[in-house]
Amino acid sequence: MAALTQNPQFKKLKTWYEQHGSDLNLRRLFEGDRDRFNRFSLNLNTNHGHILVDYSKNLVTETVMQMLVDVAKSRGVEAARERMFTGEKINFTEDRAVLHVALRNRSNAPILVDGKDVMPEVNRVLEKMKSFCQRVRSGEWKGYSGKAITDVINIGIGGSDLGPLMVTEALKPYSSEGPRVWFVSNIDGTHIAKTLATLNPESSLFIIASKTFTTQETITNAETAKEWFLLSAKDPSAVAKHFVALSTNTAKVKEFGIDPQNMFEFWDWVGGRYSLWSAIGLSIALHVGFDNFEQLLSGAHWMDQHFRTTPLEKNAPVLLALLGIWYINCFGCETHAMLPYDQYLHRFAAYFQQGDMESNGKYITKSGTRVNYQTGPIVWGEPGTNGQHAFYQLIHQGTKMIPCDFLIPVQSQHPIRNGLHHKILLANFLAQTEALMRGKSTEEARKELQAAGRSPEDFEKLLPHKVFEGNRPTNSIVFTKLTPFILGALIAMYEHKIFVQGIIWDINSFDQWGVELGKQLAKKIEPELDGSSPVTSHDSSTNGLINFIKQEREARS
């Protein structure tokens, strides 16, 4: 595929931007078109609640949107989408299909990889998860002393941690009958030490999530957990009642002491950051119940069908992707803020930090050449209204344009004080996107100062600081309620957005070679930290850091 910058449709878009981009003014666009909201929004009726995607507060016209859609079509988005859904090995650097969509394929329509339908295996593992969840949640599954399981500890890292953690936090209101869940990911001993300090080994169940069962951080933490457990249990055979594995390496799992019957497998066509729908989601199913886990899958499947069958012009993941292309590749924006106005979604931005940045943080195209355009954005964010009192200042009056996605449910899980808290939250959500769009003119700021009775001297001093340029782009994503179904749909929507952008940029969104180099060097450095001999085998900075650590350790020992 030719470089994006050589694509005729993109060149047309870029020329239009250079000629007209600086004239786009959101306040004027709204004043000149009373129907703008209706023409630049999608109301998705899932039959389990609505998802409204309002993109009218973006620096776009119908002409711009059509040019963006033309770019998507010319880059082969529709054909690439079908290749993914039909099991082609689109992750070509690892020779793998990309089939997280198969994990939530509620239609059970066959999906073939190398001529074999994967759905029977997917359903077999789901049935095994269902049976296990029912045994644990009912109290039938007992620990070594006969106690039921009260706490589940998921030990994993990256995709084996971020997804289940985000979802179990988001669906806390659905967890009342399930065990508590804990997540240990960091190799920093503090993480597992602080977690284990609160637990009773007799009623704890550890989930060890590692495809190869060789991930250094995960296996080190798992061995620490096993040592802690055996201090109480004494008998190594008790491990089988308290440890299960999410893996494909039967030999290593058995060697650890886990009964292979308690190993839940997944497949090489499941990428880590897309794996919460697989056995990696076992902690989710245990916490909220398998019925709710199935609802999560069903919501994602609904969005998969919307993405696969809806024309690009009305396709939510596609439109979100194209707006990102517009800001990154024309306006030069470098970051994207995800701002959920729901405390249960407090890990949503962190989850898609990995989802987006590990997928599209690439500078090499599929043909092996270096891109001459920007690719994946820096993704960040915090829940509202906390962010308003932290970093919104820069979004409103800073020198950088930061496109933002604002998300909120219409219905709160906790309508306390007759809904007062949620009404205030909704008001802030609505006010922020309007303020970012409209801004505050010099004349409006002047009238405000006059009404406040400020002196003429104050006028001169304060007026420039009270002006807001506005014209800051936002998407508003409003949904009926944060249910398992709606959460599944929202996650899938962003997954597909990332996919579309990767196709347009001609990069492989499904490998992650960038994480490997640091791991390789860490293996070399680890033995060099032993003893007191000075290290000289690296650059002067790395040598200096290693030797400082060794000297300080010696001095304190």
Curated annotation (Swiss-Prot):
<feature type="modified residue" description="Phosphoserine; by CK2">
    <location>
        <position position="185"/>
    </location>
</feature>
<keyword id="KW-0324">Glycolysis</keyword>
<dbReference type="InterPro" id="IPR001672">
    <property type="entry name" value="G6P_Isomerase"/>
</dbReference>
<dbReference type="GO" id="GO:0005125">
    <property type="term" value="F:cytokine activity"/>
</dbReference>
<protein>
    <recommendedName>
        <fullName>Glucose-6-phosphate isomerase</fullName>
        <ecNumber>5.3.1.9</ecNumber>
    </recommendedName>
</protein>
<feature type="binding site">
    <location>
        <position position="519"/>
    </location>
    <ligand>
        <name>D-glucose 6-phosphate</name>
    </ligand>
</feature>
<dbReference type="GO" id="GO:0048029">
    <property type="term" value="F:monosaccharide binding"/>
</dbReference>
<feature type="binding site">
    <location>
        <position position="358"/>
    </location>
    <ligand>
        <name>D-glucose 6-phosphate</name>
    </ligand>
</feature>
<keyword id="KW-0007">Acetylation</keyword>
<keyword id="KW-0413">Isomerase</keyword>
<dbReference type="InterPro" id="IPR023096">
    <property type="entry name" value="G6P_Isomerase_C"/>
</dbReference>
<feature type="binding site">
    <location>
        <begin position="210"/>
        <end position="215"/>
    </location>
    <ligand>
        <name>D-glucose 6-phosphate</name>
    </ligand>
</feature>
<dbReference type="GO" id="GO:0006094">
    <property type="term" value="P:gluconeogenesis"/>
</dbReference>
<comment type="subunit">
    <text>Homodimer; in the catalytically active form. Monomer in the secreted form.</text>
</comment>
<keyword id="KW-0832">Ubl conjugation</keyword>
<comment type="pathway">
    <text>Carbohydrate degradation; glycolysis; D-glyceraldehyde 3-phosphate and glycerone phosphate from D-glucose: step 2/4.</text>
</comment>
<feature type="active site">
    <location>
        <position position="519"/>
    </location>
</feature>
<dbReference type="GO" id="GO:0051156">
    <property type="term" value="P:glucose 6-phosphate metabolic process"/>
</dbReference>
<dbReference type="GO" id="GO:0005615">
    <property type="term" value="C:extracellular space"/>
</dbReference>
<feature type="binding site">
    <location>
        <position position="354"/>
    </location>
    <ligand>
        <name>D-glucose 6-phosphate</name>
    </ligand>
</feature>
<dbReference type="InterPro" id="IPR035476">
    <property type="entry name" value="SIS_PGI_1"/>
</dbReference>
<keyword id="KW-0597">Phosphoprotein</keyword>
<comment type="function">
    <text>In the cytoplasm, catalyzes the conversion of glucose-6-phosphate to fructose-6-phosphate, the second step in glycolysis, and the reverse reaction during gluconeogenesis. Besides it's role as a glycolytic enzyme, also acts as a secreted cytokine: acts as an angiogenic factor (AMF) that stimulates endothelial cell motility. Acts as a neurotrophic factor, neuroleukin, for spinal and sensory neurons. It is secreted by lectin-stimulated T-cells and induces immunoglobulin secretion.</text>
</comment>
<keyword id="KW-0312">Gluconeogenesis</keyword>
<feature type="active site">
    <location>
        <position position="389"/>
    </location>
</feature>
<dbReference type="InterPro" id="IPR046348">
    <property type="entry name" value="SIS_dom_sf"/>
</dbReference>
<feature type="modified residue" description="N6-acetyllysine">
    <location>
        <position position="142"/>
    </location>
</feature>
<feature type="modified residue" description="Phosphoserine">
    <location>
        <position position="107"/>
    </location>
</feature>
<dbReference type="InterPro" id="IPR018189">
    <property type="entry name" value="Phosphoglucose_isomerase_CS"/>
</dbReference>
<feature type="modified residue" description="Phosphoserine">
    <location>
        <position position="455"/>
    </location>
</feature>
<dbReference type="GO" id="GO:0005829">
    <property type="term" value="C:cytosol"/>
</dbReference>
<comment type="similarity">
    <text>Belongs to the GPI family.</text>
</comment>
<feature type="active site" description="Proton donor">
    <location>
        <position position="358"/>
    </location>
</feature>
<dbReference type="Pfam" id="PF00342">
    <property type="entry name" value="PGI"/>
</dbReference>
<feature type="modified residue" description="N-acetylalanine">
    <location>
        <position position="2"/>
    </location>
</feature>
<feature type="binding site">
    <location>
        <begin position="159"/>
        <end position="160"/>
    </location>
    <ligand>
        <name>D-glucose 6-phosphate</name>
    </ligand>
</feature>
<keyword id="KW-0963">Cytoplasm</keyword>
<feature type="binding site">
    <location>
        <position position="389"/>
    </location>
    <ligand>
        <name>D-glucose 6-phosphate</name>
    </ligand>
</feature>
<feature type="modified residue" description="N6-acetyllysine">
    <location>
        <position position="12"/>
    </location>
</feature>
<dbReference type="GO" id="GO:0004347">
    <property type="term" value="F:glucose-6-phosphate isomerase activity"/>
</dbReference>
<feature type="modified residue" description="Phosphothreonine">
    <location>
        <position position="250"/>
    </location>
</feature>
<dbReference type="GO" id="GO:0006096">
    <property type="term" value="P:glycolytic process"/>
</dbReference>
